[in-house]
Amino acid sequence: MQEQYKPSEIEAKVQQHWQDKKTFEVTEDENKEKFYCLSMFPYPSGRLHMGHVRNYTIGDVVARYQRLQGKNVLQPIGWDSFGLPAENAAIKNNTAPAPWTYENIDYMKNQLKMLGFGYDWSREIATCTPEYYRWEQWFFTKLFEKGLVYKKTASVNWCPNDETVLANEQVIDGCCWRCDTTVEQKEIPQWFIKITEYADELLKDIDQLDEWPEQVKTMQRNWIGRSEGIEMTFGVVDSEETFDIYTTRPDTVMGVTYVAIAAGHPLAEKAAANNSELSDFIEECKNADTTEAAMAAMEKKGVATGLYATHPLTGKQVPIWAANFVLMNYGTGAVMSVPAHDQRDYEFATKYGLAIEGVIKPSDSDLDISEEAYTEKGVLFNSGDSFPELDGLDFQDAFDAIDAKLSSEGKGKRQVNFRLRDWGVSRQRYWGAPIPMVTLADGTVVPTPEDQLPVILPEDVVMDGIQSPIKADKEWAKTQINGQEAFRETDTFDTFMESSWYYARYCSPHADEMLDPAKANYWLPVDQYIGGIEHACMHLLYFRFFHKLLRDIGLVNSDEPAKRLLTQGMVLADAFYYNNEKGARVWVAPSDVTVQETDEKGRIQKAVDSEGHELVYTGMSKMSKSKNNGIDPQVMVDKYGADTVRLFMMFAAPPELTLEWQESSVEGAHRFIKRLWKVAHDHVAKGATAPLDVKTLDTKQKELRRELHKTIVKVGDDIERRQMFNTAIASVMELMNRLQKAPTETQQDRALMQEALSAVVRLLYPIIPHTSFSLWNDLGNEENIEDVRWPEADQSALVEDSKLIIVQVNGKLRAKITVPADATKEVVEEQGFAEEGVIKHTEGKTVRKVIYVPGKLLNIVAN
């Protein structure tokens, strides 16, 4: 038995035990309830950061808790190991991405083990291995056969620095989410998966996600963006051509005064042949940022095409303008413009002197559009001679009437549209899974035959930083299909492909098929998924989409991939900088900072670095390389031990909120573990105890035991239902304060202490497993702690023998009394009136009323 708390020795010993016993390796067991706990797997960037530690500690706490509930718990881990950072590092270090990636995996794997996470390492996967991406390629060919994959030339977001296509979600404020380079527009052939075919189901099934955060569900609903409207056909004057427009406000159609089309619309390009101003405008729009944020902020500009459109209901001719706020790849690439009832159209019409005609007004007043558009759904008026019966109708009645009219004339139809676009999965980089499609000599594009899968990505390459090695190597692209020469696709998959199905591969990671359906359907869906909310509209949507694809191909039988989702907050740390001689900011690591002055609230006022630079303190911000304010988990574990780091991570804040890194609080967590260790070993040193006899306990012993069992109930509820791990820990700390002060003279004192400490180490086991493992054995228990059950509250101990009653006179506290739990009102009154404080404040007064709230409060009204 080790009497001193030495975390490095304790943790190494316990981790070796877990490894030798393969404690966390599991197989399917139909006789046990399963629990699949999964944290989003890491990109092997080189070192774990504190964000990883927080995510994986939360997952490990949940998994270990469920194990003590007697469940068959799967907690796997792997590596999201394709992606641009590996290419960039390879170019910088004059190596290939593969060795850099595998070295990082080895290092980070040791870090995860150092932190004591209970993973089933036998299921480890790395998405950059052919054993993994082979089945992704196979699945893609099946989707192609089902008509869910297609290739088309499309205007895409292009990062000129990384030379790759970005999804809309990967463009942040007009810049690449990875390297912050300004994004351009480029026409390029792309492979797409028809996620829009599943848009309705993806939206509808959000209602099944009862245990997902409302914020994530709202973000996905908005991203999918279902709308009901009418698609109507406009003619082109002096032409046989027509074009379609979709609107969710058909009630405003009688107020159309111009039509706006995308710069890339065929009509605009045709008109540009004889219009240099329009031609220049089209070129300008090609390189514009088309993200939502940029579109909302940019100046709305346009050029008249010289063409006119024919209104589908009135026959009126309205001008067609090319406008920078209309996108060719969104909707039909054309919008009807009603400046009286749309603010953007109003501003555009005012700028270019276009007509503004009001056709909707408030139900209780006249229309005023002198300053701005009226955008509410009022009642129709001014509908004109062609459709006068619209006047006086509200939105829905007008919608129905216009729909009926257009449908009967073959000029329009009611339609449901989605904001969601099909998923472009092509990337023009090397370090990704090759797309398994080939082009035959006659130009036909077909899937790679199954017997030629996987299409292996060569790993022994030279990165020149200019072109993908598989694009540069013309021999690699050559292949044979049925004796015919063919050429492989040299694009690779978006890495969101790999992360969309990894959770399912863990169920049968070594199967010679994509999934073993029996094993997949035993484990799936995931019971608890953990990751950042920043993934709400990318990974978490693709994750749900892929699960439905897997279901429809017969590999899984559930509709959704995860029952419960927890989105953990970021980890923040102090950030400091100084300006160098060139005026550039130099960020200084917190470990290199000396704080010289704080204010009365402890806020930093003055700090210097080790070289004497006076620093600017910018407050707490997300740990990042750019601000040099990351804290190395390895350093903290070496200094305090893994259990201390884990305890701090779980105690410092509720899991969904940001966590502020404070080393003083880490030291506090360390002191608590040392105190627990000392209390336990002081107890053990007193020798064996007699069995606990609850019938012989005195009042104080009963009160202590009641607190113990109330704590067991609260901690279980906090971890499982509320997921408020910080309050669970606080409850155990409060109990430990009482245990430290509890008497240990009698056999029953020590027997009660044995019961309490045996419960405490199990309550803390999910959070500080190394310490709990050791203390459990030191307390004389023969079984290892992983093989026992979560402590069960003794319901009889929770029954209170007495109640504490607050006694007030005229609403002010005058006494506290303890009465038997079954005391009547009369008994409570008698005892309350006998209290000195009550006598003092009622003497000489008339008692007007006595209010008794059973078991809680006695209020005496006297004057």
UniProtKB/Swiss-Prot annotation:
In the UniProt record, which is one GO cellular component term? cytosol
Q: Where does ATP bind?
A: 625
The record's listing under InterPro entries reads: aa-tRNA-synth_I_CS (IPR001412), aa-tRNA-synth_Ia (IPR002300), Leu-tRNA-ligase (IPR002302), Leu_tRNA-synth_edit (IPR025709), M/V/L/I-tRNA-synth_anticd-bd (IPR013155), Methionyl/Leucyl_tRNA_Synth (IPR015413), Rossmann-like_a/b/a_fold (IPR014729), tRNAsynth_Ia_anticodon-bd (IPR009080)
Cellular localization per UniProt = Cytoplasm
Question: Does the keyword Chloroplast belong to this entry?
Answer: no
Q: Which reaction does it catalyse?
A: tRNA(Leu) + L-leucine + ATP = L-leucyl-tRNA(Leu) + AMP + diphosphate
Q: Report the EC code(s) recorded for this entry.
A: 6.1.1.4
**Highest taxon in the source lineage:** Bacteria
What Pfam family is a match for this entry?
Answer: Anticodon_1
Q: Which key words tag this protein in UniProt?
A: Aminoacyl-tRNA synthetase, ATP-binding, Cytoplasm, Ligase, Nucleotide-binding, Protein biosynthesis
Motif span ('HIGH' region)?
42-52
Named from the GO MF annotations, one term is: ATP binding
Short sequence motif named 'KMSKS' region, residue ranges? 622-626
**Family annotation (CDD domains):** Anticodon_Ia_Leu_BEm, LeuRS_core
* GO annotation terms (biological process): leucyl-tRNA aminoacylation
Q: Which family does it belong to?
A: Belongs to the class-I aminoacyl-tRNA synthetase family.
| Protein name (record) | Leucine--tRNA ligase
**Origin organism of this chain?**
Shewanella sediminis (strain HAW-EB3)
